[in-house]
């Protein structure tokens, strides 16, 4: 685990974005942890968040031409990532995002920001069912652009209805790389270093045994 990944886990815990307990997911599963990126909700939070996304993206080595933030959660994430890439890595990358409702006045259209073209890095918080990715792909393909990859905060490394995770299904269906700041394996590694979090480690490890994908 790299330093920025450890720092991100601590940041998420500090802001209560990452919590431990018993949480019922949309799938009906009872998860021992929950990640809610919507709680990164101040200017300082977003500035720090962008630095972690930028670090993971640079670390990935994937080539891309533009950041795309799907409405709504992806919009501030793509924006702060673009700023962090410029300020901390001297990489000036265009970005754009979509509107849920198309405008018929002013500049019109369903996209805001740079022209959607070339190799697109889609930026979001997490992938659960992959539905948002598939919706975004319709927009990307409609503009004759290509999906270079998907950048998210957390990969739960968890099976969907079959043996694959939602992320693995996206990789299979669209042939793109998925970049996550942290994976469940990183979280377990972090917990194993903290004696006071032994109970959380046991619960998360048991959950992975039951629902985790094969490495």
Curated annotation (Swiss-Prot):
Family: Belongs to the purine/pyrimidine phosphoribosyltransferase family. PyrE subfamily.
Record: residues binding 5-phospho-alpha-D-ribose 1-diphosphate: 26, 72-73, 99-100, 103, 105, 124-132
Pfam families reported for this sequence: Pribosyltran (PF00156)
Superkingdom, taxonomy of origin: Bacteria
One Gene Ontology cellular component annotation held by this UniProt entry: cytoplasm
Assembly and binders: Homodimer.
GO biological process: 'de novo' pyrimidine nucleobase biosynthetic process; 'de novo' UMP biosynthetic process; pyrimidine nucleotide biosynthetic process; pyrimidine ribonucleoside biosynthetic process
Residues that coordinate or bind orotate: 34-35, 128, 156
Cofactors demanded by this protein: Mg(2+)
HAMAP family reported in the protein's UniProt record: PyrE
Pathway: Pyrimidine metabolism; UMP biosynthesis via de novo pathway; UMP from orotate: step 1/2
Protein function: Catalyzes the transfer of a ribosyl phosphate group from 5-phosphoribose 1-diphosphate to orotate, leading to the formation of orotidine monophosphate (OMP).
Top enzyme class: transferase
Keyword entries, A-Z: Glycosyltransferase, Magnesium, Pyrimidine biosynthesis, Transferase
Catalytic activity reported: orotidine 5'-phosphate + diphosphate = orotate + 5-phospho-alpha-D-ribose 1-diphosphate
The protein's Enzyme Commission number: 2.4.2.10
One GO MF term attached to the UniProt entry: orotate phosphoribosyltransferase activity
UniProt protein name: Orotate phosphoribosyltransferase
């Amino acid at each position: 685990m790299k330093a920025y990944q450890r720092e991100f886990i601590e940041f998420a815990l500090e802001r209560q974005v990452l919590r431990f307990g018993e949480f019922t997911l949309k799938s009906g599963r009872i998860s021992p942890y929950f990640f809610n990126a919507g709680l990164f909700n101040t200017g300082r939070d977003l500035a720090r968040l962008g630095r972690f996304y930028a670090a993971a993206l640079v670390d990935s080595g994937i080539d891309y031409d533009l950041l795309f933030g799907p409405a709504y959660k992806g919009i501030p994430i793509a924006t702060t990532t673009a700023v962090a890439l410029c300020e901390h890595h001297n990489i000036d990358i265009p970005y754009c995002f979509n509107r849920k409702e198309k405008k018929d006045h002013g500049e019109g259209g369903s996209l805001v920001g740079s022209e959607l073209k070339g190799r697109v890095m889609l930026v979001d918080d997490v992938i659960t069912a992959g539905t948002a990715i598939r919706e975004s792909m319709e927009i990307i393909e409609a503009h004759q652009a290509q999906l270079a990859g998907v950048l998210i905060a957390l990969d739960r490394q968890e099976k969907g209805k079959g043996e694959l995770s939602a992320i693995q299904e996206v990789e299979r269906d669209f042939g793109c790389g998925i970049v996550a700041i942290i994976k469940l394996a990183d979280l377990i590694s972090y917990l194993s270093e903290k004696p006071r979090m032994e109970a959380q480690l046991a619960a998360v490890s048991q959950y992975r045994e039951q629902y985790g994908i094969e490495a």
